[in-house]
């Protein structure tokens, strides 16, 4: 669909796509937005530069030494940053593009490699009228049940997927489930099986064989 942005393979590998990131940091407005996001999420990154000869991105970190009030700086290969930081930078491009154009972002496992508080912050950006004046939408799948929060989502914004005995998957909105009020603890109800959609785990039936393999 028009103005729909999907998570691509490069982000699934947590690697910012070279050409897209280079274009982003060469655009003053986009780079400012990216650095503001990295600052707000406590990454410690104050700048991102691209070495055209080596074709390597470097992140800049500033710090104060113990015996000096002056700040020192160091540069780190972007691939040496945490997986969460790399993924945040990789996702920022489609986030910014959708916020500017008012499109829809579709991401599988939004929370992968991200701290839960960071994931919540990204969601709140899309909920903010100030940051999202063009009504961009974020659609994502997650395994983080803490995001099932009435302060983040209405009942009609949360969906459960469930496999039946034949392996087919169905999807249902919490608003369609009888007895689900807007003031209930959604995460607690989900984890105790009230909504369905939880895996059937046969923990007592699993027995690990500690014998050494036969050579």
State where each predicted segment sits.
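Switch/communication elements of ASCE P-loop NTPase nucleotide-binding domains
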Residues: 58-189, 193-198
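Long, compositionally biased
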Residues: 203-205
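Phosphate-coordinating catalytic segments in nucleotide- and nucleic-acid-processing enzymes
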Residues: 1-92, 100, 195-197, 207-210, ...
């Amino acid at each position: 669909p028009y103005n729909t942005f999907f998570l691509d393979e490069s982000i699934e590998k947590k690697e910012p796509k070279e050409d897209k990131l280079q274009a982003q940091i060469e655009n003053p407005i986009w780079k400012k937005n990216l650095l503001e996001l990295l600052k707000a999420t406590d990454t410690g990154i104050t700048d991102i530069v691209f070495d055209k000869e080596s074709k390597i991105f470097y992140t800049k970190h500033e710090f104060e030494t113990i015996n000096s009030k002056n700040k020192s700086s160091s540069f780190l290969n972007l691939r040496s940053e945490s997986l969460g930081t790399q993924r945040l930078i990789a996702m920022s491009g489609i986030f910014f593009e959708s916020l500017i154009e008012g499109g829809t972002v579709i991401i599988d496992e939004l929370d992968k490699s991200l701290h839960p508080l960071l994931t919540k912050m990204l969601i709140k950006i899309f909920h903010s009228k100030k940051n999202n004046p063009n009504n961009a939408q974020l659609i994502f799948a997650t395994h983080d049940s803490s995001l099932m929060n009435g302060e983040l989502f209405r009942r009609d914004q949360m969906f459960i997927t469930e496999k039946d005995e034949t392996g087919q998957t169905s999807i249902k909105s919490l608003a369609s489930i009888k007895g689900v009020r807007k003031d209930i603890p959604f995460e607690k109800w989900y984890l105790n099986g009230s909504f369905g959609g939880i895996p059937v785990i046969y923990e007592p039936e699993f027995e690990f064989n500690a014998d050494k393999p036969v050579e």
